[in-house]
């Protein structure tokens, strides 16, 4: 199974494994930024254009840190840690935001930086929501760029 996943990464423009996924793919525990960088380098060598090891959960520090490697340079995408249970969908939203920015002509790293900012804002806007039990959603609409929100029927 691991080989099948690595085969998918090999053809990816951008791969965004979280800590658990990256740990399984490289075959060892990832528990700090140095290990995140090492995993990003190892997974990028498989053939992906850019690998971003996402460190949002479990929390490593007072920041939400993602480590990106494109074969040339390591980038640390940092945002203040937001204490909230409303983080459901952050990984999918991050990947979708990267894809949207790539479609608009951004480089992979530019897209990742913009996506990190978007998801952080979406988490912040939903931080105090209380919807049901367990993990709640992030505020996708509120975090969207103003020009996109104006196109909504509500004009929000």
Cite the ranges covered by each PLM segment.
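Phosphate-handling active-site elements
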Residues: 74-75, 101-115
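Charged C-terminal helix
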Residues: 109-156
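Short pre-catalytic strand/loop immediately N-terminal to key active-site residues, enriched for Gly-Thr
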Residues: 74-88
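Glycine-rich beta-alpha junction loops
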Residues: 21, 56-59, 80-83, 116-119
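Short, small-residue alpha-helix embedded
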Residues: 24, 85-108
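Short clusters of hydrophobic/aromatic residues that line enzyme substrate/ligand-binding pockets
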Residues: 30, 77, 138
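Conserved phosphate/ATP/ADP-binding segment of small-molecule kinases
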Residues: 1-73
